[in-house]
Amino acid sequence: MRQVCILVEGQTEEAVVKTLLIDAAKARDIYLIPIIVRTSLTPAGASRGGGSWKHYDRQLNDLLSQSHWDVIGLMVDYYGYPSGAPGFELPEAPGDQRQLQIVAALKEHYPDPRFHPLVVLHEIESLILAAIRAGGGRGLLSEKTIEHLIRAIDDAGGPEKINNGEKTSPSKRLLALEPEYGKTSTGISILREVGLAVVLDRCPVFAAWWRTLLSC
């Protein structure tokens, strides 16, 4: 059984991996584990989630030094991409070109062939939007919210096209419409409702990364 780890930004990403990806990986004889980035060490233990790039860099280098991993993945949002990270200084570019350039910069900085980074367009909540567009979320979100989000997704050209504005990124839209929305509760329930295949069908950037991860 191949061993694959994915360094993730926080608890939402960890829950996405556990909910959508682990069983699919197991079916391909892959042992998959999400690892939340450690941001600090305190007497109470490690703090995890987000933070500056130095935390990612330290942990990525540590994982890449371990020979038992067949693949080391990374899952980090395009929205709020950490300053100091490879490719951060790149100027805005048409369409998704800057995201592709950032991924290329990450691969150049960490040239280990086992390393496969994903810079999520534009946040991990894009997967939730994909599930909502496919019919998920009824009973968990109001019909008004669902209708509003479907219009936004269609106007943008798909859930991964919902942009990275301070008030218009996927998570900000969800929270503005549904103040009680829980990233690791409501969102994960919606994903569980529709399943992985539906999300992959509507999120081609995420799907391409996932299929590459499986085939390595």
Regions found by a protein language model. Name each.
Residues 1, 14-43, 56-216:
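C-terminal accessory helical subdomains adjacent to catalytic cores in phosphodiester-
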Residues 5-15:
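Catalytic nucleophile-elbow at a beta strand-turn-alpha helix junction centered on a G-D-S/GDSL motif
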Residues 46-53:
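Non-catalytic terminal and connector segments of soluble metabolic enzymes
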